[in-house]
Curated annotation (Swiss-Prot):
<feature type="glycosylation site" description="N-linked (GlcNAc...) asparagine; by host">
    <location>
        <position position="311"/>
    </location>
</feature>
<keyword id="KW-1152">Outer capsid protein</keyword>
<feature type="glycosylation site" description="N-linked (GlcNAc...) asparagine; by host">
    <location>
        <position position="312"/>
    </location>
</feature>
<keyword id="KW-1160">Virus entry into host cell</keyword>
<dbReference type="GO" id="GO:0039621">
    <property type="term" value="C:T=13 icosahedral viral capsid"/>
</dbReference>
<dbReference type="InterPro" id="IPR009113">
    <property type="entry name" value="Mu1/VP4"/>
</dbReference>
<dbReference type="InterPro" id="IPR044937">
    <property type="entry name" value="Mu1_membr_pen_domIII"/>
</dbReference>
<feature type="site" description="Cleavage">
    <location>
        <begin position="42"/>
        <end position="43"/>
    </location>
</feature>
<comment type="similarity">
    <text>Belongs to the aquareoviridae outer capsid VP4 protein family.</text>
</comment>
<comment type="function">
    <text>Interacts with VP7 to form the outer icosahedral capsid with an incomplete T=13 symmetry, about 80 nm in diameter, and consisting of 200 VP4-VP7 trimers. Myristoylated N-terminal peptide may be released in the endosome and involved in permeabilization and delivery of transcriptionally active viral particles into the host cell cytoplasm (Potential).</text>
</comment>
<keyword id="KW-0519">Myristate</keyword>
<protein>
    <recommendedName>
        <fullName>Outer capsid protein VP4</fullName>
    </recommendedName>
</protein>
<dbReference type="InterPro" id="IPR036256">
    <property type="entry name" value="Mu1/VP4_sf"/>
</dbReference>
<dbReference type="InterPro" id="IPR015962">
    <property type="entry name" value="Mu1_membr_pen_domII"/>
</dbReference>
<dbReference type="GO" id="GO:0140267">
    <property type="term" value="P:symbiont entry into host cell via permeabilization of host membrane"/>
</dbReference>
<comment type="subunit">
    <text>Interacts with VP6 and VP7.</text>
</comment>
<feature type="glycosylation site" description="N-linked (GlcNAc...) asparagine; by host">
    <location>
        <position position="453"/>
    </location>
</feature>
């Protein structure tokens, strides 16, 4: 059967010469980027005309209003947006005709009015903006256009779903080279595989005529030459070509997007201030309300000011009444780490003790005890507590609903907690005026015996998650600060201090800044590859100067080993991208030396601002080989279709 061609180029899906030849030169595309947000569509100004006189003045101008409502000016941006929307809808005209829905293509001029007048939001604005033969849209026309587009898009959405199902099954895009498959074999394959209710089987020619505008792999044939028709090209071929991956730099669009995002992040987040040696307002460092998790039993008080420790030579027990029963809370034996609530931030505290060992085989007291999170008030700092009399009050803020033995599961002979979370919301106002108050996860012991004399019942080895709800102030080294000197924070902490810092700590705020910088460097600069990059070269320059300075005054100065400097710089840059918080820690080679991060930030910023579309795209030959391997696999798939569904 030959193709039936008319002046509107209607093609038959089974026509002679139809072919399926995907190529990496162009990807499938035709869907327009339609931005119908208010910021794009308004305000554009109303139509004004003089009333009672032919002379336009502020006093004589009035908004034009008739039975169609007021008239808004259709500027170039609005016209382009509407045109793209209609372009997308009208592409489906073959199906609208076949299903007898719609009334022909939608034409924007049918919903607009061309006239002259003045355009503005006020009479004063309009007087300065005369328009001759401008395009306007009335209130009624806007509503009609909106309803028309919405009605058509309802049908298009369903058809698009069915077409997507059919075409993705055929895999019409490849990332390198070209491939081909017998078109009639593909038709037989699709007919067998597609669900019976897929509309592509009901309206094959109509869907085919839509698809050839969207998928470059589909090439309808000329009935005379039995070759692809020279007139048939996808409507989105410009975008398709620029979206396609090239052997040189991959996707130009993707490269451009990476570059643009990196530049915006560098500028918008003030990442160049990361090593400033002057005070910066805390507001420069955007705080994060992301939760952070800790195991308080293993945090030393010297590493985190919000951890305190009871470490009396003998244990202490204090009784309390909870839910009508009497229990004892025990501190010790040995060090017992608690939360200094006056150093804690407003937050939701969740102590997860799931899987924690329950040694009630050696301490039977625990089997009848209740896991709980309590607040302990003392008359002296907890480090100075020596007797139960020093404890003035104990409040249970969260407790399990059963005793420990009913919450346990045996794992390889060891009793452990089932999933159990002790959760409480903490607000600083609730402890105002209480100088010594501490949080502790522990057991409420109903009748302690000598078995507990040698077993510390603390549950602070559980995972404590602190989810901030309000960050009132910023702290550093336990002191409240209203400004941060980044240079003093850099390379000035142990890894334990970094890990145990609360969300309002300057360490965390600067760490968040470092993470953003590391993301920019990692996304836009080929740090992890063997390529010499701007991040590495920025560090090398500082290392070379440092080496020269170290040789000043020596009788036989040693010249720098430049290949070694490049390797050290590459390791430092890679280390920063993979774990940026290392820059906060003491003793990390190269990365924590003064000026290194400043050099890296400056070098990367310069490289990005002067970069090209290819920035951030490296190892192109390796990527090309990988893409070619995918094409080989797809061609093998197409060959199997041709063999299993021979075209007739």
């Amino acid at each position: 059967m030959g193709n039936v061609q008319t002046s509107v180029n209607t093609y038959n899906i089974t026509g002679d010469g139809n072919s399926f030849t995907p190529t990496s030169d162009m990807t499938s595309t035709a869907a327009p980027a339609i931005d119908l947000k208010p910021g794009v569509l308004n305000p554009t100004g109303k139509l004004w005309r003089p009333v009672g006189t032919s002379v336009a003045t502020i006093d004589s101008l009035a908004i034009v209003s008739d039975r169609f409502g007021q008239y808004s000016f259709v500027n170039e941006g609005m016209r382009e947006t509407f045109s793209k929307a209609l372009f997308d809808i009208n592409m489906w005209q073959p199906l609208f005709q076949a299903t007898k829905t719609g009334c022909g293509p939608i034409v924007l001029s049918s919903f607009t009015t061309t006239t002259s007048g003045y355009v503005g939001a006020t009479a004063g604005d309009a007087l300065d903006n005369p328009v001759t033969n401008g395009v306007f849209i009335s209130t009624v026309q806007v509503m009609n256009l909106q309803r028309t587009i919405a009605a058509r898009m309802r049908d298009v959405a369903l058809w698009q779903q069915h077409l997507d199902t059919a075409m993705t099954m055929l895999t019409p895009d490849i990332s390198a080279g070209s491939a081909s498959c017998n078109w009639k074999s593909l038709l037989a394959f699709a007919k067998d595989i597609l669900p019976l209710d897929n509309l592509c089987l009901t309206y094959p020619n109509e869907f085919y005529n839509v698809a050839i505008h969207r998928y470059p792999a589909l090439k309808p044939g000329n009935p005379d030459t039995k070759l692809p028709d020279a007139q048939a090209h996808p409507l989105g071929e410009v975008a398709g070509a620029f979206n396609a991956a090239t052997s040189e730099v991959g996707s130009l669009v993707g490269s451009s997007s990476t570059l643009s995002q990196a530049i915006s992040t560098m500028a918008g987040k003030d990442l160049d201030l990361i090593e400033a040696d002057t005070p910066l307002p805390v507001s420069v460092f955007t705080p994060s309300l992301a939760p952070r998790s800790y195991r308080p039993a293993f945090i030393k008080p010297e590493d985190a000011k919000w951890i305190a420790e009871f470490n009396n030579s003998s244990l202490i027990r204090k009784t309390l009444t909870y839910s009508g029963a009497t229990y004892a809370v025990q501190l010790g034996p040995g060090p017992t780490r608690v939360i200094d609530m006056n150093a804690m931030i407003d937050s939701v505290l969740t102590l997860d003790v799931s899987g924690t060992i329950l040694p009630y085989d050696t301490n039977p007291d625990l089997s009848t005890s209740v896991p709980a999170f309590v607040l302990i008030q003392t008359s002296v700092p907890i480090q100075q507590v020596t007797t139960a009399a020093n404890i003035t009050a104990i409040t249970v803020v969260s407790a399990a609903g059963a005793s420990a033995i009913n919450l346990a599961i045996n794992v390889r002979g060891q009793p452990r907690f089932n999933m159990l979370h002790l959760q409480a919301t903490f607000e600083r106002e609730t402890i105002t005026g209480i100088p010594y108050i501490y949080g502790l996860g522990t057991f409420l012991i109903p009748s302690p015996t000598s078995s507990s004399n040698f077993s510390n019942p603390t549950l602070m080895d559980g995972l404590l998650t602190v989810t901030p709800v309000l960050l009132r102030e910023t702290t550093y080294k336990g002191e409240v600060v209203d400004a941060i000197v980044p240079a003093t924070v850099m390379a000035n902490q142990t890894s334990e201090e970094v890990a145990s810092a609360l969300a309002n700590d300057a360490i965390v705020l600067v760490s968040n800044h470092l993470n953003k910088l590391a993301n920019v460097v990692g996304d836009a600069i080929p740090v992890a590859s063997k390529t010499d990059d701007s991040a590495t070269s920025a560090i090398v320059s500082r290392l070379a100067v440092q080496h020269k300075l170290s040789q000043v005054g020596q009788t036989s100065p040693t010249p720098p080993d430049y290949p070694l400097l490049w390797r050290r710089a590459k390791r430092a840059a890679s280390m920063f991208v993979s774990n940026p918080s290392l820059a906060l820690q003491v003793g990390i080679p190269v990365l924590t030396q003064s000026g290194m991060l400043s050099a890296l930030t400056s070098g990367v910023g310069t490289a990005l601002r002067t970069g090209s579309l290819g920035k951030g795209v490296t190892d192109a030959s390796e990527k090309l080989r990988a893409r070619q391997s995918l094409t080989v696999a797809k061609q093998a798939f197409f060959d199997q279709i041709g063999s299993l569904w021979p075209g007739k």
